[in-house]
Structure formats: C-alpha cells, structure tokens
Regions:
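Short, acidic/hydrophobic/Gly-rich beta-strand patch recurrent on exposed beta strands
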Residues: 140-143, 207-209, 337
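Nucleotide donor/acceptor-binding cores
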Residues: 119, 202-204, 299-300
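Internal alpha/beta scaffold segment
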Residues: 148-191, 212-234, 241
Length: 466
C-alpha cells in the first residue's frame, strides 16, 4: 500500500500560502453562514458529518484558507476545517450510521498529504475582454451555482501539472485563430480543455472539447512544443446545445489516444471518457482493502457488479488467480474492461454488457454460482431486484463499496434480512476537504442449520449498540 496513505488520524499538513499570503473563507457552514443546516433532510437518519457540531467550536479551530477563489468555487466545502477534524467528523458519521450493528467501525483510511490528489481536470473556456476591452480567452472554474467563469490558475486539490497546460491552450488560441465557445451565441470552437494525468506513469492526455471537427495542426504543435510532457492529444466534438461536456465523436491528433496508469500492480488504459478513480492514491488503498476483505481462493468465481472498466475485479483476479465475471451496463466501458484484462494477462475473465440485476437473475435461473461478489454501485445504490438476485446466488462473501453510505446502509438492511452478516466496516477518505466519504463493508453469508434456514440472521444483526 502506498506510503502516501494511512489508516489513522495522523497528518502533517497545513494549507499552503500563496505569493501574496492571501486567505479566504470557503463558505463552510459555520455559524451565520447560509446553508448551515442544509443536511438535515431526514429526521430518522444520521446527519451528514458537520451538521451536529458546535459552530463556536468550529470557528475556534478554523484555519486560514489560502485559496483565492474558495468562496466563489464551493468545490472544497471543508477547506477551512483542519484535516484531522474532517476525518473525525466522517468517522463519527459512519459510526452513527451503522450503530445498530454489533461491528466496530475501523479507523478511517486517510491521506497523509491531502493536496494535489485529483488526476482529472476539466475547465471551460469562453470569450472575455481585457481591461482595455480587447477580446481574450477566459478560462477557469464555474462560479458556484452559475456558468460565470472565475479565473483560477491553480487548485490545491488537483495535480499541479494540469492547469498550466490549460493556461497554455488559452494563451495560444488567439495566435492561431482558434476561438472560445460562447454559450450565449453557440458560436466559437473550444468549449472545454480536459487534462488527465496517470499518477504512476506520468503520462498526460489533453482532450479539447470543440464545437468543430478539426483544429489547426500548427496550434496543436505549439501546445506540444510548450508541453512536451503531453503524451496524447484528442479532439472531442460536441456541437449540441447542452451542458454535457463530452460529445460522442473523437479524433486522435497526437499519440495513441489514451494513457495508461498502474494500480495495485495492474495496468489500466484510460481514454477521455473512461471512468477512472480521480484519487489514485486513495483508490489503490481502497482496492487493496477490498481484496483483503474478500479473502479469495484461486478456485473462486468472482462477480464484479457495476464493474466499469474492470479495475477492482482485475486487481482481485490477478492477486488470486480466481475466475472473474464483470457486469456493466455501459457497453463502451465493457470494451475498456476487456482491453484491461488483456493488458494484465487475465485470461479467465468475462465481461457482460448488461444490467447487473438482470444478469444476476439470469445466472440464478441457470443455476450458476458466485463465491465472492464485489459491488460498487452509483450514488443511488442498488435496486431491489439486484439485491434479491444477489441473495439468490448466495455468495459466501460480499464486498460492498459505496460513495454514499446512506444508500449503502439501506441496501445492507436488505442483505441482512436475507441471511448476511456484517463482518467489517472501513471508511476511506477519497475526497479530502469535502463532506464525501467512501465506505467499504464486508458481509458474509450466515451458516445454514440442518433444515436449510439461516441461523439468527436478523436477530444477531439487530442486537448492536444504539
């Protein structure tokens, strides 16, 4: 596991100061700030991590935020909160959420240095004017709650190599007659610049999202001359009047059209549209934790539900030699998963483009078996049909990875009712300085008695602390 990640509250970090030593509030919901109670939406469920705490205490411990756009951005809601306090709030949230179950929540896994972790940066470009009224290219972030672009040359949670590339794109555009896109008039060329950086290999992909199918070659050459570290450039065409960033058509302008990164000893191909964890340091720790929880055998048959490009399943299959069946609704992601399996020499892997619940139902009807299931559903959680069919298949272990623990606990109640027991709970801080927390739960199938019923499956689970 990377030494940049640790599983306790220790850290050695203070917010960096900029050249002018400026500090800004970040809009965190302290006393008097609008939105202080915005998480109190369900009376009978635990509040999100910051809601219940004394605002005077938070004000006393608040740190100076050295981000010139923190108030206008809103992306890092907790930037003014000391990192160890952020971790404490997230730990408390998970512990309260799972308080009805007799399983101690393990210490939250966290970053030693919670800066520069985002490997994907996508920023809009638009027409602007300088102080003399001359046309310029405006680039930066959308102001919170609007589509007004706020100039921002660096961001403390992004890889520092990304924004200078986007700045160069904006600077060179007028020299080559390349115009920024106007949302008001739907004219102009460049809508977004997207940079993806491979943490382990340092490969860099620049994707230019354009209201056009071509760009001047001299313009692309100038970008590459200024940034020889770029390994591939892709033109993504999006001519629709939409807030969706990427279009469906792409053309490779330089390099292979993708980059490759490494996680847990496996290599993964990343395109402009591929889903790939934006915090690779935390992702590696999370995957190693998930595989450890699964306790796989070489004879096992693994199900990887909502598998995306196959990352978790491939890491597990390579570590154990077990057979892998990955299920993902997005057909393009399935193609990426198949390529990733080939890259890593995983020969006993099959990927299916289907709804996970429907595929599990088909497998159950055919009498197929799964020994271990990894599930990493979207924020909305799993469907009742998926959970019912998962219970029918009856794997001995289920490793449930969630980006929304509130929907995770809802789904887990269904699995517990159908004969599973929670064995381990471990939160992971994938997104420092935000209220988001990832959570990994291991469930095991309760043993059957001689009459075929599961013993104490519900009573045991409901006997926990309150």
């Amino acid at each position: 596991m990377s030494n940049e990640f640790e599983d306790d509250y220790g850290y050695d970090w203070q917010p960096p100061s900029d050249d002018e030593g400026r500090g800004f509030d970040d809009g965190f919901p302290f006393e008097g700030n609008e939105g202080a109670d915005r998480w109190a939406d369900e009376e009978d469920e635990p509040a999100k991590p910051a809601e219940k705490y004394d605002h005077h205490e938070l004000l006393e411990q608040r740190v100076t935020v050295h981000c010139p756009v923190a108030e206008r951005c809103g992306g890092c809601e907790w930037l003014a909160m000391p990192y160890d306090m952020q971790l404490e709030r997230k730990q408390d949230y998970i512990e309260e959420l799972f308080a009805d179950y007799p399983v101690e929540v393990e210490p939250l896994m966290c970053m030693i240095d919670p800066r520069g972790y985002r490997n994907k940066v996508q920023l809009p470009l638009a027409p602007g004017k300088d102080k003399n009224g001359n046309p310029t290219v405006r680039w930066g972030i959308f102001e919170k709650g609007s589509h007004w672009i706020v100039p921002c040359k660096q961001c403390m949670v992004e890889d520092p190599a990304a924004r200078p590339i986007i700045g160069t794109v904006a600077r060179l555009m007028p020299d080559y007659g390349v115009t920024p896109y106007s949302e008001k008039t739907c004219t102009g060329t460049v809508r977004y610049a997207l940079v993806r950086i491979a943490h382990a290999t340092d490969e860099i992909m620049l994707t230019l999202v354009c209201n056009a199918t071509t760009l001047p070659k001299a313009f692309v050459d100038a970008i590459l001359s200024a940034h020889p570290e770029i390994t591939t450039v892709v033109l993504n065409t999006n001519t629709e009047r939409t807030s969706v960033i990427l279009g469906k058509e792409e053309k490779v302008l330089f390099g292979p059209g993708y980059i490759e990164d490494e996680l847990c000893g496996c290599r993964f191909r990343i395109s402009s549209s591929s889903f790939y964890q934006t915090n690779p340091i935390a992702a590696e720790a999370l995957y190693e934790l998930a595989v450890e929880m699964a306790d796989l055998r070489s004879s096992d048959r693994i199900g990887d539900a909502y598998c995306g490009t196959g990352t978790i399943g491939i890491v597990a299959a390579k570590a154990s030699g077990a057979e892998l069946i990955g299920i993902e609704r997005n057909a393009e992601a399935v193609k990426d998963a198949e390529i990733n399996a080939q890259i890593n020499g995983i020969e006993n892997a099959t990927f299916v483009a289907a709804d996970a619940g429907s595929e599990f139902a088909r497998m159950a009807r055919r009498g197929e078996e799964l020994d271990v299931v990894f599930m990493d559903p979207p924020r909305a959680g799993s469907s009742q049909a998926f959970l019912a069919n998962l219970s029918r298949l009856g794997p001995r272990r289920v490793v449930y990875i969630s980006c929304d623990p509130k929907t995770q606990i809802r789904d887990i109640k269904h699995l517990v009712h159908n004969g599973y027991r929670i064995k381990r709970i471990c939160p992971v801080d994938m997104f420092p300085h935000t209220d988001h927390v990832e959570n990994v739960v291991l469930l095991e199938r309760a043993p059957r008695n001689q009459f075929g019923h599961r013993r104490n499956s519900r009573k045991d689970e409901r006997g926990g602390k309150r």
